[in-house]
Amino acid sequence: MRKGIIISGNLAQDHEFIYPYYRLLEEDFEVDVCLLEGKPVKGFLGTDLPPNKNHKVKKIEEVNPNDYDILVLPGGVKAMEKVRQNLDIIKFISDFNAQNKIIACICSGAQLLISAKIVKGRKIAGYYSMKDDLINAGAIYTDLPAVVDRN
């Protein structure tokens, strides 16, 4: 079975977490949820994350990039401000990228890509307030709703 992982934290943008969570399940992925806090949290709009109360939340120390086929990084600027400070999470993202596996980054989740130093020379779409940060990190910023560049 294919495995996906969603990495985020408290105050993630609810729909940016929930939609990929259920879409992965619908596509028969086993989905792990790794939250900075190591326990269920609330989204920015108050939704329980993960939405399934029986879903076990993992800590970053419990996960290995070798075990997953896809990584999802939902947005939520308040969450990303804290998540990007966790060096173990940043290393996970960097190691995942080094294996050329799919990374789906939504909105301000691109902050994690900047911190992992994996945006240089890549087309990246992100929340408009991150445009300067992405360009300064070497990304080719686009305001398209979605973009694919390599993995």
Indicate residue ranges for each PLM-predicted region.
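Acidic/histidine-rich helix-loop elements
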Residues: 44-51
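Active-site-adjacent pocket-lining segments in enzyme domains
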Residues: 2-40, 52-151
